[in-house]
């Protein structure tokens, strides 16, 4: 009887030998309620236009092309569409959201608003933008773009002040100076309206430095005032630098309502597009796949900076991106990461996706879903069995009862047999 607990424990450990359930470096989903946002590496429609049609252009398995769970556009990104005239209406909905885009706005594009501007500021903007997107898509099912209507009572029109190469900023819009103003020391306003969504991500941006125009330096100052609630959001230029600064953006999450955009100095800016967030859901971390070029082009790590637990899991390849279609399309490592979309998985964690929910040699960090448990028994290669102990306890009791019955029966027959021999 005293050997029984040891027997059960040894059997349990032996049963776990040879079984391993490590976290895998993939993105996956618990069930069919998922959605992917991407670019050319997951744009099935773009592949249709290649001649000849060649699915090696993508990192996405072509079996997913007809799933209806992908919103991707070659040459674009959510950040690029949010700020610039190069626009694609990313739209999708799901409990589990995956992002594999961002590479189409990197240091390789070298965007800056003016010739003396700074691309570093735009990389900072990119990181702040995706932080808001990832955080909010952990609690919202639906993402799309909406236009933001505004009313400006002056005669001046919006101006393309901020542009570089093929990229022209149109969100926020700049309202040009009125002809009767001799300089930029003036206050001006415009009404804008947010309606139809649960919440919105909108930009509030300023030139954070001394802006030079006709020998005069100006400090940018921009505010949004919610006329329904009385809440005001604002930014004022605080830097004294005259070169090397650019358009610093904050990304506000605002409710529906009537707003007033206010400029106290320099040009008035007003949002023209917003990320529309709809359908609140239970907290579900998003998954982000690193979006970068082959090393021949300069990339950034802003999506990694923006993707932090517990609201986001980041997946990356350990090697340089080397495509088979061309060096920037069809990489084996990233194809492997996306292959997890072909099947359901029970558990997600910071380390990766677990294929089974029973036992693992690795403790899941920031776990989500039905996750395995594990323990260290000072033998790194031997995971302890951590199944539900109740069945083992019951089995032990039954075995103990069986042993007692067998012993009693043996004693009974031995005594009975001895009595018979004595009587004979």
Curated annotation (Swiss-Prot):
Q: How does it sit in the membrane?
A: Single-pass type I membrane protein
- Which spans are transmembrane here? 393-413
Task: List the cysteine pairs that form cystine.
Answer: 44-65, 113-162, 197-276, 205-249, 307-312, 347-371
Q: How is it modified after translation?
A: N-glycosylated in the RER.
Its localization reads: Virion membrane; Host cell membrane
Residues with an annotated glycan are 54, 89, 153, 236, 301, 316, 358, 417
Enzyme class, top EC level, equals: hydrolase
Q: What is its EC number?
A: 3.1.1.53
Q: Which residues lie on this side of the membrane: Intravirion?
A: 414-424
Subunit comment: Homodimer; disulfide-linked. Forms a complex with the M protein in the pre-Golgi. Associates then with S-M complex to form a ternary complex S-M-HE.
Q: What is this protein called?
A: Hemagglutinin-esterase
């Amino acid at each position: 009887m005293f050997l029984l607990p040891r027997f059960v424990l040894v059997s349990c450990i032996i049963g776990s030998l040879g079984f391993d359930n490590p976290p895998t470096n993939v993105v996956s989903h618990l069930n069919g309620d998922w959605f992917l946002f991407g670019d050319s590496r997951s744009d099935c429609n773009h592949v249709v236009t290649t001649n000849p049609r060649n699915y090696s252009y993508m990192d996405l398995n072509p079996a997913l092309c007809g799933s209806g769970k992908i919103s991707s556009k070659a040459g674009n990104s959510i950040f690029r569409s949010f700020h610039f005239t190069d626009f694609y209406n990313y739209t999708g909905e799901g409990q589990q959201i995956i992002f594999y885009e961002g590479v189409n706005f990197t240091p390789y594009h070298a965007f800056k608003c003016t010739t003396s501007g700074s691309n570093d500021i735009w990389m900072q903007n990119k990181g702040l933008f995706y932080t808001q997107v990832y955080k909010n898509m952990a609690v919202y099912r639906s993402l799309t773009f909406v236009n933001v209507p505004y009313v400006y009572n002056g005669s001046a029109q919006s101006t393309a002040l901020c542009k570089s190469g093929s990229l022209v900023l149109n969100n926020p819009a700049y309202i040009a100076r009125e002809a009767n103003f001799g300089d930029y020391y003036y206050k001006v306003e415009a009404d804008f309206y947010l309606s139809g969504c649960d919440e919105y991500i909108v930009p509030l941006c300023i030139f954070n430095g001394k802006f030079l125009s006709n020998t005069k330096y100006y400090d940018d100052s921009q505010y949004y005032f919610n006329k329904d609630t009385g809440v005001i959001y604002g930014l004022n230029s605080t830097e004294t630098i005259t070169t090397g600064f650019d358009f610093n953006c904050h990304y506000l999450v605002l409710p529906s309502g009537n707003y007033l955009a206010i400029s106290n100095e320099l040009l008035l800016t007003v949002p023209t597009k917003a990320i529309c967030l709809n359908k609140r859901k239970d907290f579900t971390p998003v998954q982000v796949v690193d979006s970068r070029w082959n090393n021949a082009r300069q990339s950034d790590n802003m999506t990694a900076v923006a993707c932090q637990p517990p609201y986001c899991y980041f997946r990356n390849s350990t090697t340089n991106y080397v495509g088979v279609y061309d060096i920037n399309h069809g990489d084996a490592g990233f194809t492997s990461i996306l292959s997890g979309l072909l099947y359901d998985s029970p558990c997600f964690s910071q380390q990766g996706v677990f294929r089974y929910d029973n036992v693992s040699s690795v403790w899941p960090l920031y776990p989500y879903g039905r996750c395995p448990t594990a323990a260290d028994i000072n033998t790194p290669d031997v995971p302890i069995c951590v199944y539900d102990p109740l069945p083992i306890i019951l089995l032990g009791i039954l075995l103990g009862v069986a042993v007692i019955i067998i012993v009693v029966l043996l004693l009974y027959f031995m005594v009975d047999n001895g009595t018979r021999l004595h009587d004979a």
